[in-house]
């Protein structure tokens, strides 16, 4: 498990007054800053990000000290991290997991063989879905994150076991990215009620 959780990435500027567009990986996109200051990948630069608005697929944010488009554009591609210690110590219950701990885990099939790797976690309103990049190429499939479909989650051992419904693997698509630019680790999901967790049901 990582000590710092990826919660978003700056994908570009917005307007001419220093606002930035952030792809938020929190379950509630507007909760990006609810847990305190964020930092870059090195942990040396901290950002007191302020969420101002929401647009299609992104949140519009202000960062103190960033006052024009040039400065905002210079931050493009910056990944934003949150210290795990900033989350409530008792946030997780049984069968609940931080999405960041699932990202990158290999997914094996119950009958043997490797299905792929968890690319991201989505919530389209009917429960969490795992987007798994298939082992044989850059295609992906969405798996319902339920005990029936994902009977084993072992974060400490670093693996998941899946039992996809018949025909589900026929519905594949390219992995999700950010405007074709950001496809690496999407990061943590933080529940909209502020407890920073997700899980199989």
Curated annotation (Swiss-Prot):
GO terms for molecular function: ribosome binding. The keyword Transmembrane does not apply. Signal peptide: none annotated. InterPro entries: PRC_barrel-like_sf (IPR011033), PRC_RimM (IPR056792), RimM (IPR011961), RimM_N (IPR002676), RimM_N_sf (IPR036976), Transl_B-barrel_sf (IPR009000). It comes from the Bacteria. Residues 180-194 have a biased composition (Acidic residues). One of its GO terms (cellular component) is ribosome. Its main location: cytoplasm. It is found in: Cytoplasm. One of its GO terms (biological process) is ribosomal small subunit biogenesis. Residues 164-201 are annotated as: Disordered. Binds ribosomal protein uS19. An accessory protein needed during the final step in the assembly of 30S ribosomal subunit, possibly for assembly of the head region. Essential for efficient processing of 16S rRNA. May be needed both before and after RbfA during the maturation of 16S rRNA. It has affinity for free ribosomal 30S subunits but not for 70S ribosomes. PANTHER family: RIBOSOME MATURATION FACTOR RIMM. HAMAP family: Ribosome_mat_RimM. Belongs to the RimM family. This is Ribosome maturation factor RimM. It comes from Rhodospirillum rubrum (strain ATCC 11170 / ATH 1.1.1 / DSM 467 / LMG 4362 / NCIMB 8255 / S1). The gene is rimM.
């Amino acid at each position: 498990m990582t000590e710092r959780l990826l919660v978003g990435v700056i994908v570009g500027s917005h307007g001419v007054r220093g606002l930035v567009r952030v792809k938020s990986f929190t379950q509630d996109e507007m909760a990006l800053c609810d847990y305190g200051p964020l930092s870059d990948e090195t942990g040396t630069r901290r950002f007191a990000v302020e969420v101002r608005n929401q647009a299609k697929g992104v949140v519009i944010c202000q960062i103190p000290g960033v006052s024009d488009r040039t400065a905002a554009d210079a931050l493009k591609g910056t990944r934003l991290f949150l210290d795990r210690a900033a989350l409530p110590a008792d946030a997780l219950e049984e069968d609940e997991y931080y999405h960041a701990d699932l990202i990158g885990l290999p997914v094996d099939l119950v009958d043997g063989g490797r299905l792929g790797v968890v690319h991201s976690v989505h919530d389209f309103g009917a429960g969490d879905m795992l987007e798994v990049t298939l082992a044989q190429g850059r295609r992906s499939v969405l798996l319902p994150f339920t005990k029936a479909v994902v009977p084993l989650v072992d974060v400490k051992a670093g693996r998941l076991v899946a039992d996809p419904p018949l025909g589900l693997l026929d519905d594949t698509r390219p992995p999700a990215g950010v405007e074709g630019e950001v496809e690496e680790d999407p990061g943590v999901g933080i529940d909209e009620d502020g407890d920073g967790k997700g899980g199989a049901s």
